[in-house]
Amino acid sequence: MIKIKRGLDLPISGAPEQRIEAARPVRSVALIGFDYHGMKPTMAVQVGDRVKLGQVLFTDKKNPSVSYTAPGAGVVSAIHRGEKRVLQSVVIDLDGDEQLEFARYPADKLATLSAEQVRDNLLQSGLWTALRTRPFSKVPDPESSPSSIFVTAIDTQPLAADPQVVIAEQGEAFQAGLTVLGRLARVFLCKAEGVSLPGEALSGVTAQAFSGPHPAGLPGTHIHFLDPVGAGKSVWNLNYQDVIAIGKLFTTGQLWTERVIALAGPVVEKPRLVRTRLGANLDELAAGQLQPGNNRLISGSVLGGRTAHGAYAYLGRYHLQLSCLKEGDQREFLHYLRAGVEKHSLLNVFVSRLLGGKRFAFTTSTNGSPRAMVPVGNYEAVMPLDILPTQLLRYLIVGDTEMAQKLGALELDEEDLALCSYVCAGKYEYGPILRDNLARIEQEG
């Protein structure tokens, strides 16, 4: 077991009850272009087209064999584009249950599949996009091979679902998915301390337990300790629900679009786990579930998710949470004179620091305006990786990609710096800054 000592479990109220309930049905689903870094789409459909579940919506110009398929059957109702015609989302109004069939295999034959058979089925079904590389967090090139594949079956994000609850319902499919992935590369199954999961004893699968505060459950943490990456070495990672989907695909020949997500946050009337579907419309999902007021829906974690609004009002491809916060749009009178009983800080600046175990109703307010970066040891307190966070963040801010690489930037994704953004007195958002640097590194070296 690997024990993480540095980090932070955000003391936010509204944690979900770890029991799965059916969510209200949604009328539309979507694929979000923002989820796929560096992807340039070649559209295969247009508005008004009727599509089947699993039908190709678009492919990647850089990797034409990588297909992005429909998460539901129905009619393409909108293709949203932003500045410079960047793809924002492809929306499907659900209608019917027509679906494409893909290759299926007996469960006892999965261990004999060739890597080519596995790749072909994942590519044709669109489930290849469940995989992401590290470095760069992109959908992998089908011609590439990873050093290893990391399955994240632990979740320490604030307000997250317990993976063990979800996997318990789909144990056979999860084990089948692990078997299939093992045909591509060795698999690290990362789990919580004291948890037993299906497939741990499979040949080619190495189970590793992690404990401690967040980010003990992030793939970046697991990769750093078990199989570190660099400029000449890459690994792939995916979450536990995509492993289940892969197992379902290979044993049934059909796409499994179910998603169990945490509907939680301080403004949620009944925080719980809900059963919905990939790419679900979050406005519809949250309707009638929140306290009255001006609230924000976040696809993903409160630390590293994105605002779900307009063209982006859908569940992200890699997200397993719908987090809901009150908009922090009201300024407090003489806030600097208050004791801060209802505010949280990593530093000893509020009275709340003395109230151990207290949960806070966080809002979207940053509690301050942007200012200079101040190195007071707060980054080191939440960074468990063997890197120098203050120095790395400074080089990322000024865009010195050479020094950023030397200090470990290639090991990181936006979510790995989310806690640094949270504890930053200067109110920097390090995730987008890291992404800009990674894009430059990939283009220029």
Swiss-Prot record:
<comment type="subunit">
    <text>Composed of six subunits; NqrA, NqrB, NqrC, NqrD, NqrE and NqrF.</text>
</comment>
<dbReference type="InterPro" id="IPR056148">
    <property type="entry name" value="NQRA_2nd"/>
</dbReference>
<keyword id="KW-0830">Ubiquinone</keyword>
<keyword id="KW-1278">Translocase</keyword>
<comment type="function">
    <text>NQR complex catalyzes the reduction of ubiquinone-1 to ubiquinol by two successive reactions, coupled with the transport of Na(+) ions from the cytoplasm to the periplasm. NqrA to NqrE are probably involved in the second step, the conversion of ubisemiquinone to ubiquinol.</text>
</comment>
<dbReference type="InterPro" id="IPR022615">
    <property type="entry name" value="NqrA_C_domain"/>
</dbReference>
<dbReference type="InterPro" id="IPR008703">
    <property type="entry name" value="NqrA"/>
</dbReference>
<dbReference type="Pfam" id="PF05896">
    <property type="entry name" value="NQRA_N"/>
</dbReference>
<keyword id="KW-0406">Ion transport</keyword>
<dbReference type="GO" id="GO:0006814">
    <property type="term" value="P:sodium ion transport"/>
</dbReference>
<keyword id="KW-0813">Transport</keyword>
<dbReference type="Pfam" id="PF24836">
    <property type="entry name" value="NQRA_2nd"/>
</dbReference>
<dbReference type="Pfam" id="PF11973">
    <property type="entry name" value="NQRA_SLBB"/>
</dbReference>
<keyword id="KW-0520">NAD</keyword>
<protein>
    <recommendedName>
        <fullName>Na(+)-translocating NADH-quinone reductase subunit A</fullName>
        <ecNumber>7.2.1.1</ecNumber>
    </recommendedName>
</protein>
<comment type="similarity">
    <text>Belongs to the NqrA family.</text>
</comment>
<keyword id="KW-0739">Sodium transport</keyword>
<dbReference type="InterPro" id="IPR056147">
    <property type="entry name" value="NQRA_N"/>
</dbReference>
<keyword id="KW-0915">Sodium</keyword>
<dbReference type="GO" id="GO:0016655">
    <property type="term" value="F:oxidoreductase activity, acting on NAD(P)H, quinone or similar compound as acceptor"/>
</dbReference>
